[in-house]
């Protein structure tokens, strides 16, 4: 019995001019998601998805490569201007932002949306090296 050939789904080209780049820079990884104004994901990338493993994922260079990849995918959909929302304490915050600007996007605003607890959960124990 022959299997049906699996059909490859091609991504249709959306024509979106402006969007929001969400940069989530944690201590272990940096994730970049580019959405339209309503919050629908247009493109995404992360340091881990770009082939970095372990402690190399948390480097600024890995964040730069991930931002360039997400920006290239978003530019295929016609995106030109971005608002950037940065969250998290990681080292890839500034380098991801610079990579998006170097990719040819016009950055209209930069917002830090890192959540700060009003004495919520107990923090993890101190590292002793």
Curated annotation (Swiss-Prot):
Any one Pfam family match given in the protein's UniProt record, by short name: Ribosomal_S11
UniProt keyword Chloroplast present: no
An MF annotation (GO) of this entry: structural constituent of ribosome
Entry GO CC: ribonucleoprotein complex; ribosome
PROSITE patterns to which the protein is assigned, alphabetical: RIBOSOMAL_S11
Keywords recorded for this protein, A-Z: Ribonucleoprotein, Ribosomal protein, RNA-binding, rRNA-binding
GO process terms (BP): translation
HAMAP family reported for this sequence: Ribosomal_uS11 (MF_01310)
NCBIfam families xrefs: PRK05309.1, uS11_bact
SUBUNIT field: Part of the 30S ribosomal subunit. Interacts with proteins S7 and S18. Binds to IF-3.
Protein family per UniProt: Belongs to the universal ribosomal protein uS11 family.
Described function: Located on the platform of the 30S subunit, it bridges several disparate RNA helices of the 16S rRNA. Forms part of the Shine-Dalgarno cleft in the 70S ribosome.
Name the UniProt record assigns to this protein: Small ribosomal subunit protein uS11
């Amino acid at each position: 019995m022959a299997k049906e050939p699996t059909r490859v789904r091609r991504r249709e080209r959306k024509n979106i001019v402006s969007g929001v780049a969400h940069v989530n820079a944690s201590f272990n990884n940096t994730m970049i998601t580019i959405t339209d104004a309503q919050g629908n994901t247009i493109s995404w990338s992360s340091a881990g998805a770009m082939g970095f493993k372990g402690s190399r994922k948390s480097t600024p260079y890995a964040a730069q490569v991930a931002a360039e990849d997400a920006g290239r995918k978003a530019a295929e959909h016609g995106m030109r201007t971005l608002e950037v929302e940065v969250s998290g304490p990681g080292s890839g915050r500034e380098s991801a932002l610079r990579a998006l600007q170097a990719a040819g996007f016009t950055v209209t605003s930069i917002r830090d949306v890192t959540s700060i607890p009003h004495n919520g959960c107990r923090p993890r124990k101190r590292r002793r090296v």
